[in-house]
From Swiss-Prot:
Belongs to the cornifin (SPRR) family. InterPro entries: Lelp1. This is Late cornified envelope-like proline-rich protein 1. Residues 1-26 are annotated as: Disordered. It comes from Homo sapiens.
């Protein structure tokens, strides 16, 4: 046995990676798993992560809002926050007795 054979079988990094050049340029997830890790590291700065955009930071309605303004789940366009002029707002406090 030669030392070359040993290093090839023991070191997975020396295994040839069958990567598609087009795949490397596009940094698509269709590449072989053996190449993906290396591709992602090399292409992280080049390729925008359009396939997995960060979820929009939607602010849910305040917890004290009445049932007429339920919090809405995040959608592509962030839903508007609960309007401050909710029809079922708390009534004004009773005036002090004179």
């Amino acid at each position: 046995m030669s030392s070359d054979d040993k290093s090839k079988s023991n070191d997975p990094k020396t295994e040839p990676k069958n990567c598609d050049p087009k795949c490397e340029q596009k940094c698509e997830s269709k590449c072989q798993p053996s190449c993906l890790k290396k591709l992602l590291q090399r292409c992280f700065e080049k390729c925008p992560w359009e396939k997995c955009p960060a979820p929009p930071k939607c602010l849910p309605c305040p917890s004290q809002s009445p049932s007429s303004c339920p919090p809405q789940p995040c959608t592509k366009p962030c839903p508007p926050k609960c309007p401050s002029s909710c029809p079922h707002a708390c009534p004004p406090p009773c005036p002090p007795p004179e």
